[in-house]
Amino acid sequence: MAPVAFPTSFFLCLLLASGLAQAGRLLVVPMDGSHWFTMQMVVEKLIHRGHEVVVVIPEVSWQLGKSLNCTVKTYSISHTLEDLDREFKYLSYTQWKTPEHSIRSFLTGSARGFFELTFSHCRSLFNDKKLVEYLKQRFFDAVFLDPFDVCGLIVAKYFSLPSVIFARGVFCDYLEEGAQCPSLPSYVPRLFSKYTDTMTFKERVWNHLIYIEEHAFCSYFLRTAVEVASEILQTPVTMTDLFSPVSIWLLRTDFVLEFPRPVMPNMVFIGGINCLQKKSLSKEFEAYVNASGEHGIVVFSLGSMVSEIPEKKAMEIAEALGRIPQTVLWRYTGTRPSNLAKNTILVKWLPQNDLLGHPKTRAFITHSGSHGIYEGICNGVPMVMMPLFGDQMDNAKRMETRGAGVTLNVLEMTADDLENALKTVINNKSYKENIMRLSSLHKDRPIEPLDLAVFWVEYVMRHKGAPHLRPAAHDLTWYQYHSLDVIGFLLAIVLTVVFIVFKCCAYGCRKCFGGKGRVKKSHKSKTH
């Protein structure tokens, strides 16, 4: 009789169930905005699994802490929601006027004011002595944090707790420094570079210059964060000091999107964690889709950041959308373009993932944020990408390189450009085939990204960190890391040996040839 083959899912269930009997205490320090959407999914799953979760947030925020069935602790801050909105709108407005396509222009430009506000939150948190005392007495097992505003890193170091980072990536070189992960500019493209992993000589030169630029300007950009951290911890620290103790890096990407590169054992890839199971559409959106006929629909969203587009650009977009036979569902809260065609429907919100999963969806117009990109990949929808800032240009380049979409410069494009791009991804079958191949690769995995994230958070809670995954490179000096002392020592030995051999040869030559010359010379003098 053949042995019974247990399904893989059975073992995965055992894997995830292993932590149920060891419910722990988790401190969560999140970042506001779209970052919270996916982090919240992990937090809710951990609550469902019986853990005691405490979320610490400022009293003024857009999305944080809403509808959570756990303890939420707030602290007062010096600015209002209007201040936050103003800085964010300025950041958005700037991208439509003077695009910041370099790490220097972005970090020292429109983003600086917004991040100055978020960096100041941590000072307000630690000024609340009752809250700090409460957190100290809870004896948490770990901190689950978003590193974008740095406060979670400071909290973890202050309370000496193991930490789990949840992020798409990290600005500057702090992923490489914090995880001690090699990132050679010869084939690993830097953020904002828009390069692939196959670079020309000129591109490799520029990639190295971007790397140098990061080192030059990131310290200026993060100056306030470092000052706040040093003040709270009562000792001078650097950003590397804050990132180095991290136990696990949960990175919202994978190698379906990213180019292959070295990784470390404490880096876990959970790309597509935001791809939820498709739900049935509401009657309103079902009616829109059904009315589209054989041509289907196009989903258009530039994310939560873009609430309004300059009038001239909005009219160009509306003109292009009116030229295609598909029905366009456009998520937009700005002023309605006067030339909006009948096939274009403006909505303030749309169920993006559910619409992308509908068989009648033909294309996805996106700003190339990682959430939208992965929803496009999961549902196999070719994309027209309009990146504006941050990692969006790099995300778009990666999808374009894989033949799954077309990238447009949203500031320079015309109505003809958008029309042609849409017709290309809809009518050229190769784009649909390529995105379906990426979707198949992405879904072929032994465990869902959400379950994987939950497992590693619980792992750190159970074992009070993951020191066995921490490379010894953290404890080396810069010259030891690059083996400059070893190279210098070996070079000194080689030079010493060469010097000795040279001296021996010179001495031998003098003995062999110098002696004969003197003998001959003395013989001639005697003859005379």
UniProtKB/Swiss-Prot annotation:
InterPro entries: UDP-glycosyltransferase (IPR050271), UDP_glucos_trans (IPR002213), UDP_glycos_trans_CS (IPR035595). GO terms for molecular function: glucuronosyltransferase activity. The modification N6-succinyllysine is found at residue 97. It catalyses: glucuronate acceptor + UDP-alpha-D-glucuronate = acceptor beta-D-glucuronoside + UDP + H(+); 2-hydroxy-17beta-estradiol + UDP-alpha-D-glucuronate = 2-hydroxy-17beta-estradiol 3-O-(beta-D-glucuronate) + UDP + H(+); 4-hydroxy-17beta-estradiol + UDP-alpha-D-glucuronate = 17beta-estradiol 4-O-(beta-D-glucuronate) + UDP + H(+); 2-hydroxyestrone + UDP-alpha-D-glucuronate = 2-hydroxyestrone 3-O-(beta-D-glucuronate) + UDP + H(+). Its EC number is 2.4.1.17. Its main location: endoplasmic reticulum. It is found in: Endoplasmic reticulum membrane. Keywords: Endoplasmic reticulum, Glycoprotein, Glycosyltransferase, Lipid metabolism, Membrane, Signal, Transferase, Transmembrane, Transmembrane helix. Belongs to the UDP-glycosyltransferase family. This is UDP-glucuronosyltransferase 1A9.
